[in-house]
A protein has these predicted regions:
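Conserved active-site alpha-helix within GNAT-family acetyltransferase domains
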Residues: 118, 130-132, 141-158, 162
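Conserved beta-hairpin
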Residues: 22-40
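Conserved acyl-donor/pantetheine-binding loop and adjacent beta-alpha core of acyl/acetyltransferases
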Residues: 36-104
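Conserved beta-strand-loop-alpha-helix junction that forms the acyl-donor binding cleft
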Residues: 103-112, 136-145, 162-165, 172-174
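Hydrophobic, well-ordered beta-alpha structural blocks that scaffold small-molecule cofactor pockets
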Residues: 83-90, 123, 127, 150
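Conserved acetyl-CoA-binding loop-helix of GNAT-fold acetyltransferases
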Residues: 104-107, 113-126
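Conserved GNAT acetyl-CoA-binding A-motif
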Residues: 99-100, 127-140
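Active-site rim helix/loop that mediates acceptor-substrate recognition in acyltransferases
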Residues: 2-25
Length: 175
């Protein structure tokens, strides 16, 4: 339901961002840019207990938002069903520890097509190159594929399971 999605997105995005503030090593966010880039440097060590606790808290908070919005559990059920598309577990197949994973790249709609996403992507690529890292990311929007291909990303695979949603898994090898 588009109306439910519109109401839930700010809540779920806020919850995700709270989790990322706690668990991500590199973070770019700016009201001036009206854009956000969240990445995870997979070479960095982390406190597993803190990571799992933060992730559990975020999952519980997301679930509560979904149930509050739709007490029938229909939205919650669909969210659970789509779980395969809402994570980066596919990256385990890469067997690559020197990797930067792009979790979020978003630009406010009124600032799109002004080069903000390209500027943030250039910065992520620069960091990865300096550290000899592969970059991985996923997108659910087929229209984004052309943008990523401009940065030498290649399609690693496509996840498609229970419904029409596809997850495009992309990598950029260290060059």
């Amino acid at each position: 339901d588009p109306d439910v999605r519109k109401r839930l997105m700010p809540e779920l995005f806020h919850c995700d961002m709270d989790e990322f503030y706690e668990t991500c090593e590199i973070f770019a966010d700016s009201e001036e840019l009206n854009s956000v880039l969240v990445v995870s440097d997979e070479t960095e060590s982390y406190n597993l207990f803190h990571f799992l606790l933060t992730e559990a808290k975020a999952t519980l908070q997301n679930d509560l938002y979904l149930i509050k919005e739709d007490p029938s559990f229909h939205t919650f059920y669909n969210f659970i069903k789509g779980g395969d598309y809402l994570n980066s577990s596919w990256t385990q197949q890469l067997h690559q520890t020197k990797r930067l994973h792009i979790i979020y790249l978003a630009v406010h709609p009124r600032m799109q097509h002004h080069g903000m996403a390209a500027m943030l992507m250039d910065e992520a690529i620069r960091y990865a190159q300096e550290h000899g890292m592969m970059i991985s990311l996923e997108t659910h929007n087929e229209k984004n594929l052309e943008f990523y291909k401009k940065f030498q990303f290649k399609e690693y695979g496509i996840l498609k399971k229970n419904f029409n949603l596809k997850q495009y898994c992309l990598i950029r090898e260290y060059q």
